[in-house]
Design a protein with these regions (language model features):
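Mobile active-site "lid"/loop adjacent to the S-adenosyl-L-methionine
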Residues: 254, 314-358
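Conserved S-adenosyl-L-methionine
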Residues: 199-309, 314-329
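Glycine- and acidic
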Residues: 18-21, 165-166, 190-196, 227, ...
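Aromatic-residue hotspot detector
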Residues: 39, 47, 75-77, 83, ...
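Intrinsic-disorder/low-complexity loop/linker signature
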Residues: 62, 73, 166, 249-250, ...
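Tryptophan-centered motif/residue detector
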Residues: 14, 83, 271, 317-318, ...
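Glycine-rich, flexible loop segments associated with nucleotide phosphate handling
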Residues: 168-177, 222-227, 254-261, 353-358
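Non-catalytic, mostly N-terminal accessory regions of nucleic-acid modification and defense proteins
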Residues: 1-217, 287-298
Length: 358
């Protein structure tokens, strides 16, 4: 992606907060609107070309087949993605039909959100997006924000388009969208220093980790790789690992290697960012799970080729110990290891660390 275009796009999105959200949100809460709206606009843009096909599938399932619930296979086949939207609306049509009534716009916007498939509904809930659009409508800025995100002067779509002056704006690839999203996250993290350490690992640290893990095997990269991060945050470590392996301008250049990313994140908003980032980049979003890695194990029995992580060191996890130990007995097999005793016989050993390393 052209860096000048990338920087212009990030700057435009960043300016939306100052132009529309000042005095509506405190500065530290701008991200609560901007990040989910970026995700929403991108997903909306991806679905636009197949919108009519999805609406035809809606009629077929509802009127011809008399289905009481949507058949996901039919819907995703129509949308060409693992997600879909069954409403009549797009963000462009919401803006195009808007009047001065913020409440009418709010009602239409809610219908639009309700039309998304279950995997996107989860992201909407985690972002608390319905509450945000209601707040913006009540403050008379919802239309202003929508106008910015559908402006012809920025391109969050995967297609080349013309701006208001007739100049071509390049298409935004999935990789380019990932760069834009990660740059926005980085800027918001810098703005909110008190939160940065909770879900952000500096890019140079991730770069060092990927070198340490993958450099030694750069000449032995298999055709299929699985990578897991049990405290994945916004997914930066996962996506950077894949990029380090497959980048045609990188050291390894394993462009034909299929990389499958898996992660788990305990914070709802951070999980939503990670999962939506995977969607935006065309990865399988169902490989990202929400919850504590310590208390639940959605990947039980799964083996991964590599694991990279930067867990929240210094944070007590005493409240989750009950899921791992019952008194002195270890009840989670992940924390039992086989060790040989003095006579060379294998025995189960307790590998549970202290509940606080602070």
């Amino acid at each position: 992606m052209n860096h000048a275009v990338h920087n212009k796009l990030v700057s435009f999105i960043w300016s939306i907060a100052d132009d529309c959200l000042r005095d509506v949100y405190v500065r530290g809460k701008y991200r609560d609107v901007i990040l989910p709206m970026v995700v929403l606009r991108r997903l909306d843009a991806l679905l636009e070309p197949t919108k009519q096909h999805v609406l035809e599938e809606v009629v077929f399932q509802k009127e011809t087949m008399k289905f009481t619930e949507w058949d996901d296979k039919g819907m995703t086949a129509a949308s060409k993605y693992v997600f879909y939207n069954t409403s009549e609306w797009t963000l462009q049509s919401l803006h195009g039909s808007a009047t001065n009534s913020q409440q009418i716009l709010l009602g239409n916007f809610e219908d639009y959100l309700n039309g998304f498939s279950a995997n996107v509904q989860e992201i909407i809930e985690m972002f608390k997006l319905r509450a945000q659009i209601k707040h913006m409508a009540n403050k008379d800025v919802l239309l202003d924000v929508l106008e910015k995100f559908t402006s012809p002067d920025i391109n969050l779509t995967p297609f080349e388009k013309l701006d208001t002056a007739g100049r071509k704006i390049p298409a935004l690839t999935n990789l380019g969208m990932g760069y834009v999203f990660e740059e926005l996250i980085r800027k918001f993290n810098e703005e909110n220093n008190e939160e940065a350490g909770e879900h952000y690992t500096p890019r140079e640290v991730i770069d060092l980790m990927t070198h340490m893990v993958f450099d030694p095997i750069k000449d032995k990269i298999p055709s299929v790789i699985t990578i897991y991060d049990p405290a994945c945050g916004t997914g930066g470590m996962l996506t950077e690992s894949e990029l380090f392996i497959t980048d045609e301008e990188g050291k390894i250049k394993a462009t034909n290697t299929s990389v499958y990313l898996f992660g788990k994140e305990v914070n709802d908003e951070t999980y939503a960012i990670c999962k939506s980032d995977m969607m935006i980049k065309g990865k399988d979003p169902e490989h990202i799970k929400v919850g504590s890695t310590l208390s639940t194990d959605e990947f039980a029995g799964t083996k991964f080729d590599f694991m990279l992580s930067n867990p929240p060191y210094g944070k007590s996890w005493a409240s989750e110990q009950k899921y791992i130990k019952d008194g002195k007995d270890v009840i989670d097999n992940r924390f039992l290891i086989k060790l040989k005793n003095y006579w060379g016989e294998e025995e189960d050993a307790d590998a549970v660390p202290r509940s606080s390393d602070g």
